[in-house]
Amino acid sequence: MSFPRPANTPWLVPYLTVRDASAAIAFYRNAFGFGVQDEVHDHGRPIHVEMTYQGQLMLMFAPEGAFGSTAKAPAGAGFECPQNFHLYCDDVDTVYQHALDQGAASIMAPHDAFWGERYAAVRDPDGYRWGLACRPATA
């Protein structure tokens, strides 16, 4: 029996549309610490990107217009993104600040949430919302 997905690949991976793939790579790398696993180019520009976090494939994306698509990033289409990504990280406050430094907009400043996690939220330059969370250190 064959394994239906590549090793170290989740069963579900978001595939986003971004305005500029090179800019998105820089944002996700510098804001969240993601790494590039695969990058396909056309005429010197990335048209398909796969990014990892903590050793797992986290997301894939293509720029607007790639492969003949008419899809737009939320910021490019002028609408509020209906989904929210929930990213666990080692230090919410630091990742939140890195995201702001890279051009994200604050949705919610870091705080101790009622459900027991340290939590913050940002909107990335393409309009996607990211919740940043970590569990409190145990004494």
What does each of the following model-derived ranges do?
Residues M1-Y15, I25-D90, T94-R123, A133-A139:
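Vicinal oxygen chelate
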Residues V18-D20:
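Conserved beta-strand-loop-alpha-helix junction that forms the acyl-donor binding cleft
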Residues D126:
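C-terminal catalytic core of tyrosine-transesterase DNA break-rejoin enzymes
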